[in-house]
Design a protein with these regions (language model features):
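Glycine-rich phosphate-binding loop of ATP-dependent small-molecule kinases
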Residues: 1-191
Length: 191
């Protein structure tokens, strides 16, 4: 599982993990971005939520993850990026994984010391990827929500599992991935 504020490099590293280890990258942000473009009531609701920079409600997020975990491609493992974001989601994920006879092997906490660095990265990504929903106001709101609701989950996982690994995410992509890979290879050796 990858945890950290938006713009900390989770998506980039998740793609590298997915490719290297042959496990699916489950990015809730991507799932929501796809769904909000659909001409449905749910799509319009998601678009409004996302454009405000708010978090999607726990119930909907849990249903999305539950349906995604049911696919057979997650049996060898998976990379969770952007979920859980609240304590209710973390507790629901624990229940879902227990029901599948699985657990979270490791939680990578992506750390970026400077909020301005995150804002700069996200604005650059918005321009490169044409993300109209990544306005400075929406980005600041999502960073605030991360600090309020999601950052405390790192302590939850540290206290309940002791498997949190801090990653200094301001380094070059290759250095960050080398550190992640070393940890993951160590886990595979213990299985």
């Amino acid at each position: 599982m990858l945890m950290g504020p938006q713009g900390s490099g989770k998506g980039t590293q998740a793609k590298l993990i997915s490719k290297t280890y042959g496990v699916p990258h489950i990015a809730t942000g991507d799932m929501i971005r796809e769904m909000k473009e659909l001409p449905t009531d749910l799509g319009r609701e998601l678009k409004d939520i996302y454009d405000r920079g708010d978090l999607v409600g726990d119930e909907l997020m849990i249903r999305l993850i539950d349906s995604r975990l049911d696919r057979g491609d997650t049996l060898p493992g998976l990379v969770l990026d952007g979920f859980p974001r609240t304590m209710a989601q973390a507790e629901a994920l624990d229940t879902l994984l227990r029901g599948l006879g699985r657990d979270i092997d490791v939680v990578f906490e992506f750390r970026v010391a400077d909020r301005d660095t995150l804002l700069e990265r996200m604005l650059k990504r918005a321009a490169e990827e044409g993300r109209s929903d990544d306005t400075p106001e929406a980005i600041r709101r999502r960073l605030d929500l991360y600090e309020e609701q999601t950052a405390p989950l790192v302590e939850y996982y540290r206290a309940t599992r002791g498997n949190v690994v801090g990653v200094h995410a301001e380094r070059p992509i290759e250095e960050v991935f080398a550190e992640i890979r070393e940890t993951l290879d160590g886990l595979e050796g213990r299985r």
